[in-house]
Amino acid sequence: MVERAKILEAVTTAIEKAPKRKFSESIDITINLKNIDMAQPKNRIDETILLPNGTGEKTGICVIGRGDIVTQAKDAKVDLILGPDEVERLGGAPREARRVASSYKYFLAETAVMPQVGRFLGPRLGPRGRMPMPIPGQTDIRPIVERLRNSVKIRTKDKTVFSTKVGSTAMTPEQVSENIDAILKRVESVLEQGHLNVRSVFVKTTMGPSVRLV
């Protein structure tokens, strides 16, 4: 486990060393694992992690369904709403389907339309790890949407090096540090040897140099 003060020091240094911009930049961490065989599926990480302070940037969410779930999606101001007809149409429009799959981070789908989603969008969403979360009828999706807006998804596949967004330069270093702390604790909790499987951690802004944390 990394001490919070050390995380804060690395975040502050990364922000200070980054070229000054007139716009907000993302802040990311890159984690390099060791002594772990990622060819074994049981060792791979596939986690959605709620950040205590959000990402500081907009997270694209798509809701698929009809009726009440559509009404709730509109109330929650999600970025894209698709009905069954649109899903089927995208099945015959591969370029547009790829754009949808890459443009939105999270997908929610009414349980009743999941077979159509699997058939027509599965080939685009599956490889990206973005198959929709099934939503049973009468479920209030608004708290789910709010949670996802403040979450990041880590999916390593068979790689030992992976990166994730942890915040933005519009946030305070303390807020970003809290987010990093939450991510590292979650990652270490699913590794067989915990922090002993972590070779290094670097933090950087989009345009700035990397600063070693671990």
From Swiss-Prot:
Xref: Pfam families: Ribosomal_L1
The keyword Ribonucleoprotein is assigned to this record: yes
Coiled coil: none
Disulfide bonds listed in the record: none
Subunit and partners: Part of the 50S ribosomal subunit.
HAMAP family: Ribosomal_uL1_A
Purpose: Binds directly to 23S rRNA. Probably involved in E site tRNA release. Protein L1 is also a translational repressor protein, it controls the translation of its operon by binding to its mRNA.
Record protein name field: Large ribosomal subunit protein uL1
Organism: Methanoregula boonei (strain DSM 21154 / JCM 14090 / 6A8)
